Amino acid sequence: MRKLLAGCLALCIPALLTAQTPADSISRTETIDSVVVTARRPLMVYKQTGNIAVDIEQLKYAPLFAGEKDIFKFLQLLPGVSAGKDGMSGLLVRGGSNDQTLILYDDVPIYNQAHAYGILSIFSGETVQSAEMSKGYISPAYGSRLSALTQIRTREGDRRNHRQSLTVGTLSLAGTLDGPIKRDKGSYLISARYFFPEAVLAIADNAVRYGFYDVTGKLTYDIHRNHTLSLGIYSGDDHMKNKEDHAENGFGWGNTTASLRLESRWNDNLRSSVVAYYTYLQNRQETKFKDDGFSNWGKTTFKTHEFGARMTFDQRLSHIWMLEYGAAFSHQRFEPMHTKSIINGQHKNRGYSSEQLVSGALFLNNRFQWGGWRADVGVRGAVYDNSEQTKYAVEPRAQLSYDFGRDNSVWLSGTINSQALVQFNRYYYSMPIDFWTPFRDGRLQHAWQVSLGGRAKLHENLTLSVEGYYKRMRNLPLIYDSDDFLLSNGGFIYGTGRAFGIEAMLQYQTERLSLTASYTYTDSRRRSDGVTYPFEYDVPHDFNAFVSYDVVKRPGRKHTFSLNVAWRSGLPYRLTNESYPDTDGNPIIGITAYPTMRMHNYFRADVSYNMERCKRNGVRNWQFSIINATWHKNPVSIYPYRGSYKATVLIPIMPSVSYTRTFGK
């Protein structure tokens, strides 16, 4: 079977030769207009203990954010995973914070996955090939985070045909080109998009201007029949400006990544993968003021650089024993704050000393598989050096599972993880302008987790998965005021954490209908200075459901309706409850160190209608979506207002439309 274009297939069926017939004796031929092969895959598939893969094909039917497809919105549907605030692109897993989830984009660490202040992620739906999350057993090949591993992979270009696609959304424009470099030997892929809400803001006579762009590229080439080389790049940037009378303020942030990978097949039992990468994150803030002969310009930047490499070998020692082993290295440099200013022509520079972290790791995993049994036993040994201290970590990991038959299995796992990085929240919740720093005071963060789960096929089309977990964390750094921390260059306040919960996911599949529903009960706590309190993203009850139905399904044409519903408990919140005057007598509002209340429960319903049609030279697709169709007001923050309090709502009702045209076979 050869794929020609999304939604259309060319089927080549070999004929079995049973007799010889002269060609000139064949009286006629029959041409079949089309052959339709239909099958539905579940939205999410459990691969092993606590590890879930997302079906990227379903992404094109999901409701759009401002006309954009976002894989992170799918990942946030997973049980045990939360976005944090409404509309955010965070991945908070099993009582962990966003910085405790390792996000890899083609094996390159990503330090800021947000566009549009977190409403969208940096991963374009046009380029993503696969997305997997590990929140139970994590391969020893990966470490440096406490909670989870998320791997996003970019698809390769087509090796036989050149293709082009153009997508016009409500506030965005995207284009993708891919095709062969040399037929059946190599391919290229380049994709770019631009988000331009400033057009709407200008019509509304708003002083705020905002937009973002990103570019993704990938080259793949078989330098030998057993060796494939690939080069991947990504660059993206967000910018926002606000003009008022004599002043102008701006924010911005961006990622740049590059990776070079060599995959080799040495023989039937040995394969290897070597990747070298670079990742860069910069956040910036800029102010301008000019009035009555006084002028002021200032710019503050925060930067994170990382160079790294990883070598992995997969070796089959026998029909029941597979070995995975290798090494990893990284060098990170953090520039926490550098300020340039010009005041009435006088130049001033101020910066804090940069910090660095050098990390190395060796890892080994033994996989045994016999009958229905499967066992993984591995260990990761890591060393971290921050120029002042060197710390070592040994992380054993193990899992055991038994498969009773198709879609019926049980599993048990235990993991130990360590982390040497800390993400600063410039405010008391995660924002794209946060920055990173290495461990201090000789303390690495540590966590251990045990989980037990199973999957059962209740009916031909109905599957239920259930998993429970218990996790402990220690040496968690708590920072209440990042500016004071930078000024004093001091240490952290440390605490401990505990989380447990049970996760359930129900999936129902027919030829036309796909339903995935998940429920999570969890209890996440933190303890510091003798006080135990709810984790700021603790959500005791969390329910998500995604359903898609093919309203029209016939050769060359498909209409799909989809609905996504989310309900969860309100988040704990640190209420501003006191104020004190500054030197000019203006009130400064204080924020408590611990949550003192919970916000209202969260609810959101998103709907979408997708119309896809195959053309002679490609595919045409229209998609209409409404985010928060019920216009439910979900607060993201609370602030004092005239002796009382008001809530800030980020996501109102958001209708959008998207048109995609694909050309090529």
Give the predicted meaning of each segment.
Residues 470-472, 492-572:
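Gram-negative outer-membrane beta-barrel transporters
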Residues 246-265, 302, 353-357, 416-473, ...:
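Outer-membrane beta-barrel signature, preferentially recognizing the C-terminal barrel domain
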Residues 20-63, 98, 265:
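Short, acidic, small-residue-rich periplasmic hinge/interaction motif at the N-terminus
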